[in-house]
Amino acid sequence: MMHQMLNKKDSATHSTLPYLNTSISWGVVPTDSVANRRGSAESLSLKVDSRPGHIQTTKQISFQDQDSSSTQSTGQSYTEVASSGDDNPSRQISFSAKSGSEITQRKGFASNPKQGSMTGFPNIHFAPAQANFSFHYADPHYGGLLAATYLPQAPTCNPQMVSMIPGRVPLPAELTETDPVFVNAKQYHAIMRRRQQRAKLEAQNKLIRARKPYLHESRHVHALKRPRGSGGRFLNTKKLLQESEQAAAREQEQDKLGQQVNRKTNMSRFEAHMLQNNKDRSSTTSGSDITSVSDGADIFGHTEFQFSGFPTPINRAMLVHGQSNDMHGGGDMHHFSVHI
């Protein structure tokens, strides 16, 4: 009965721990109690910090069953270390299940039951845990886990790599029709209306005209002709027209101002030249300017014109009157003599 219970425990341990392999050594073990192993051994260890200086007790329970054909041993050890005088005692529990044809080391533990518990920190060796299992990839496009059907050959990795964020996974080439399609909220009603209309036409077996392309050719040509900025964006034509008109108005104003300035400069130059001439005349004149006009026919008589240094409206009128007399006179030409 006891043998059957041990076999059940042994099989349960084999089924629950298929990928863990650890070894525990407690202090010095006599060499005569160690034999060659002929099978695989699986063990599990759970360690919690043990504090030195406390009373420690060790319990060991071992069972042995020998068969007539070969010597087989199945051992189960239960070790408990307890500390007294503390509300939260630290414990160290280790249990192992060994199968196959091997000789247990209970003699060493029986001879020195407290040899390993005298030190606060026993020598425990842990083999690296290895587990092979597949996991799902996280796809940012879906915002969740990608189904396993899209990944027929899921790779295996160590448990240390589980916490690592996987890279981007490409979406499947063929998506099912049941997948949701996200559209703009403002376009939803129009899209549904067009779909219903298309479904009605298909049910009536009516010819459906070819769907228009997204961008008409004329719009494409117009877009090519439109002016673009440095970044490739379209420029506003209204603003361009306003800016061009403003620039033209500014140019006209500048031209007008330039013409006015030129006129002023020309007038100032002319006035300066006239003043210079008048100064020269005044310096060379000894008396008054006398102008006499004589007519050979003596029809109009002698007329004398006196001009001052500066032309006046009266002198101009007299000059014009003399010219008119010359034009209407029927005799000889008038002779003007000016004494300076």
UniProtKB/Swiss-Prot annotation:
Residue numbers spanned by region Disordered: 43-116
Cross-referenced SMART domains: CBF
UniProt KW Transcription keyword: yes
Pfam families referenced in this protein's UniProt entry, alphabetically: CBFB_NFYA
Protein name (Swiss-Prot/TrEMBL): Nuclear transcription factor Y subunit A-3
Subunit structure: Heterotrimeric transcription factor composed of three components, NF-YA, NF-YB and NF-YC. NF-YB and NF-YC must interact and dimerize for NF-YA association and DNA binding.
Tissues expressing the protein: Ubiquitous.
Top-level taxon of the source organism: Eukaryota
InterPro entries, A to Z: CCAAT-binding_factor_CS (IPR018362), NFYA (IPR001289)
Biased amino acid composition, Low complexity: 60-77
Keyword Transmembrane in annotation: no
Function according to Swiss-Prot or TrEMBL: Stimulates the transcription of various genes by recognizing and binding to a CCAAT motif in promoters.
Family, similarity comment: Belongs to the NFYA/HAP2 subunit family.
Alphabetic keyword roster: Activator, DNA-binding, Nucleus, Transcription, Transcription regulation
DNA-binding region: 212-237
UniProt-recorded Gene Ontology molecular function terms: DNA binding; DNA-binding transcription factor activity
Bias type Polar residues, positions: 78-103
Main location: nucleus
Compartment list: Nucleus
